[in-house]
C-alpha cells in the first residue's frame, strides 16, 4: 500500500489499485482503490480472479511479500505466464517463477524481472539455462549472460551488482553506475524504483531500456 501511495502521489497515473486477499477486508478502510480477491482460510490468495484482474490493468507490479502458500504461488505463476499486460516482479515475487514452470513463464514478452543476482542464479538453474550467473563474476561476464539470456527469452531484466545497475532487454544490456543515480544499495530494493520504472514505461512504452534508465535519476 505504501508503494501504491508513492506511485499515485508522485506520478500522474490515473488509477493505482491495490489487490489484496479478502481476508484483510475487515481490517482495512473501504477505499476505492482496494481490490479484494478470494482468499484461503490462512489468508492467502486462492488464485480465483487473479488473471482477470491483471488483464484489466495497463501495467502490473507484483511488489513482493508473497505468501509461501503453495496454492498462491501456483496460481500467481499461472497468471504471470499468460499475462497479456506488462508485469514487473520484484523482491520475493520473482521467486514465483523459479518455483513454477520457468521455461514457459519466461517466454511471456510482457514479463519484467527486477531481481537480485542470487535470484537470477536460481532462476537460470531452474530453467536449465546453459550459462551460470553468480555474485563473484565480473561485470562483463554478467552482462554477457544477460545479453544471451534476453536473446533466448523475451523477458526484460533489471539487476544490481558491483556498484552497477544492469538493464537488459532483447539482447541489449546497459550498465549505469549506482553512485550516479538517486539510489543507494539499500533504497534500490525498497520498491520505489520498481514503481517508478512502471510509471516511466507507461509514459514511454516503446523503449524499455531508455524509460528504465530515466527512472534512475
Located regions from the model:
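Small-residue (G/A/S/T)-rich helix-start motifs and N-terminal tracts that mark the onset
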Residues: 1-86, 95-109, 117, 124-217
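Active-site segments of SGNH/GDSL-like serine hydrolases
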Residues: 114
Amino acid at each position: 500500500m505504501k508503494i501504491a501511495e508513492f506511485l499515485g502521489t508522485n506520478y500522474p497515473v490515473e488509477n493505482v489499485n491495490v489487490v489484496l486477499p479478502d481476508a484483510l477486508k475487515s481490517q482495512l478502510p473501504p477505499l476505492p482503490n482496494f481490490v479484494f480477491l478470494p482468499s484461503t482460510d490462512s489468508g492467502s490468495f486462492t488464485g480465483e480472479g487473479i488473471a482477470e484482474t491483471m488483464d484489466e490493468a495497463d501495467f502490473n507490479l507484483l511488489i513482493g511479500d508473497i505468501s509461501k502458500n503453495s496454492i498462491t504461488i501456483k496460481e500467481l505463476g499461472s497468471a504471470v505466464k499468460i499475462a497479456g499486460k506488462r508485469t514487473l516482479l520484484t523482491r520475493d515475487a520473482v521467486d514465483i517463477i523459479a518455483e513454477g514452470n520457468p521455461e514457459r513463464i519466461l517466454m511471456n514478452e510482457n514479463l519484467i524481472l527486477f531481481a537480485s543476482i542470487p535470484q537470477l542464479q536460481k532462476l537460470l538453474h531452474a530453467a536449465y539455462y546453459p550459462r551460470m550467473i553468480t555474485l563473484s563474476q565480473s561485470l562483463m561476464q554478467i552482462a554477457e549472460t544477460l545479453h544471451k539470456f534476453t536473446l533466448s527469452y523475451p523477458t526484460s531484466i533489471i539487476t544490481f551488482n558491483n556498484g552497477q545497475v544492469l538493464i537488459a532487454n532483447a539482447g541489449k544490456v546497459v550498465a549505469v553506475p549506482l553512485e550516479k543515480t538517486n539510489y543507494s544499495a539499500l533504497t534500490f530494493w525498497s520498491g520505489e524504483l520498481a514503481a517508478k520504472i512502471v510509471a516511466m514505461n507507461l509514459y514511454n512504452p516503446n523503449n524499455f531500456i531508455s524509460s528504465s534508465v530515466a527512472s534512475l535519476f
